[in-house]
């Protein structure tokens, strides 16, 4: 009974409708995602379940499927299948690029800031390794934000034993490619970065 109560409270506290309204998901996200014609799942319900997982950080198997999916018999495996498919075919990326392009007038591109962020890793996962300086296993990402701190893009994750300059030109190319899809250019824009990015290779990039 206690477990059921805790789960119920957790679901209520992380109500997906409090994060993003259905009409916004339908208008801004769903046009870039698709399912097979034979699928009996509702696209909106599936996306909301995926967003719940991203918001709470829970394991896929811990998603309260019945809370989001009306089709009986649906499992977390099915939700993961669609989420993973949209990741691999670039659907999520297209949706995000479209959002950046549509609302770029709200961005402050007078200056952009580049920085790396290490996230502590507790379980086995891809792109994670022991970081001797921080003394824990971590994964590292490079983030580019506008002058307001709004995230514009991030690189693919690398294992935590690498510093911010590891394959910097490759990762910065990823960021530039994403921004180009959104119709944003860093040409003639001042970019601020800390001393960890100071290298001849990056200066002459």
Describe the residue ranges of each PLM region:
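Short alpha-helical elements
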Residues: 1-205
